């Protein structure tokens, strides 16, 4: 155990030196190698204030691992052992999809730009033996599933929205006995389902069919059903999306990247504009937009559906901003781990505990949506004070007759 801890600390020093002074791509490779080997030390900080009861479980921390980090079953369980309370494999399509994929790292902005037209993954069918093998591990783990972009385009042109239902149902049926939650991924910026997220006639049948399928496939303990929405949503579309999620009675909603550089002029990444780069971005530049999206969604959901957030979380402050906006859980993504290293979990836990105690919260649950609730209260109070006050000249005359 001591040897493993020393090895982990040594790897962490090398990793951090590579990020700060040399080559982020090599740090990226070292990160995955170290996690696959299980060499990095635990970063869990035990404090009851971080605990929350959610989805029929007690989670010791609101911090988890986003999808996109582990598509081959190599590192997620190692990360869970480091102290994260939940994690997501994927995203996966039914069969293997390997579109061209290139990543660009921007250290100063703590951002990663990916140029990829689809969901690069080995496919659910190939991963099934691994899911079966790890089914009895105690970790609270989900699987993210999606439809290939080319399938979506073909189905939309032919008006065959039912094809989405069939494919999501088939994937859900296979994985339901082997996970704690299933995430229906509508977030890819190149995805037509991303555009149709506001169309209840397309999304609701998928949600309802999957919920019914998982009950039949895993009757004793059916997995929860989450929906992952795109960050590229127009803020004016949030009420429609919230109505669809409530009507579908989903168990959770995931608000996460990536964001499209082409669609979001607010995103500024040093070097990307000069080279006229396009693609999808994760990391620090998405944080502000993610927080605002959480706040608006929380307002319309009225706390009835837990929000799982992921977007530019690099310390306790940015994690708390998501929580205060309305997120019940917070995920770290690939950018967080690469630019801050595996030690980010200890950093976030330590700083989050300090923030919660400083703000006089007795439990983590009390902090969820605290900023948003204040904004709602102020807005309601403002609307009340701005109502015209009619003062009758004669108290015997009813106000409507004046």
Positions of the model-derived regions?
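Glycine-rich beta-to-alpha transition loops that act as phosphate-gripper elements at the mouths
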Residues: 67-70, 144-148, 229-235, 303-317
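Alpha-helix-loop-beta-strand connector modules within alpha/beta enzyme cores
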Residues: 121-138, 199-221, 274-305, 348-359
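A gly/proline- and charged-residue-enriched helix-loop-helix capping module
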Residues: 92-140
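C-terminal helical cap(s) of enzyme catalytic domains, especially alpha/beta-barrels
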Residues: 99-111, 264-278, 336-361
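Glycine-rich phosphate-binding active-site loops on the catalytic face of alpha/beta enzymes
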Residues: 88-96, 254-261, 313, 319-347
């Amino acid at each position: 155990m001591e040897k493993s801890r020393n090895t982990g600390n040594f790897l962490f020093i090398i990793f951090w030196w590579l990020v700060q002074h040399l080559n982020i791509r090599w740090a990226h490779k070292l990160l995955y190698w170290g996690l696959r080997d299980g060499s990095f030390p635990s970063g869990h900080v035990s404090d009851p204030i971080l605990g929350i009861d959610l989805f029929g479980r007690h989670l010791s921390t609101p911090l988890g691992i986003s999808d996109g980090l582990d598509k081959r079953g190599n590192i997620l369980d190692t990360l869970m052992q480091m102290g994260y309370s939940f994690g997501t494999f994927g995203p996966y399509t039914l069969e293997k999809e390997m579109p061209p994929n290139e990543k660009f790292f921007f250290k100063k902005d703590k951002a990663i730009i990916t140029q990829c037209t689809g969901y690069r993954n080995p496919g659910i069918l190939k991963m099934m033996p691994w899911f079966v093998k790890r089914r009895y591990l105690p970790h609270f783990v989900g699987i993210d599933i999606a439809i290939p972009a080319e399938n979506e385009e073909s189905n939309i042109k032919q008006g065959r929205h039912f094809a989405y239902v069939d494919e999501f149902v088939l994937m859900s049926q296979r994985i339901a006995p082997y996970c704690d939650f299933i995430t229906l991924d509508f977030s890819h910026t190149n995805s037509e389902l991303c555009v149709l997220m506001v169309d209840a006639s397309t999304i609701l049948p998928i949600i309802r069919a999957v919920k019914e399928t998982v009950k039949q496939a895993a009757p004793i303990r059916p997995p929860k059903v989450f929906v992952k929405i795109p960050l590229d949503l127009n803020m004016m579309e949030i009420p429609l999306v919230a109505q669809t999620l409530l009507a579908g009675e989903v168990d959770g909603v995931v608000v996460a990247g990536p964001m499209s550089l082409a669609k979001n002029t607010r995103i500024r990444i040093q070097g990307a504009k000069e080279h006229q780069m396009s693609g999808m971005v994760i990391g620090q530049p998405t944080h502000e937009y993610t927080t605002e999206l959480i706040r608006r969604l929380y307002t319309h959901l009225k706390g009835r559906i837990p929000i799982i957030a992921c977007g530019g979380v690099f310390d306790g402050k940015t994690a708390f901003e998501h929580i205060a906006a309305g997120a019940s859980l917070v995920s770290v993504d690939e950018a967080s781990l690469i630019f801050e290293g595996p030690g980010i979990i200890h950093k976030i836990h330590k700083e989050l505990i300090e923030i919660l105690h400083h703000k006089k919260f007795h439990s983590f649950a009390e902090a969820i949506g605290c900023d948003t609730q204040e904004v709602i209260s102020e807005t309601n109070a403002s609307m009340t004070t701005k109502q015209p006050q009619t003062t009758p000249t004669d108290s015997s005359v009813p106000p409507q007759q004046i």
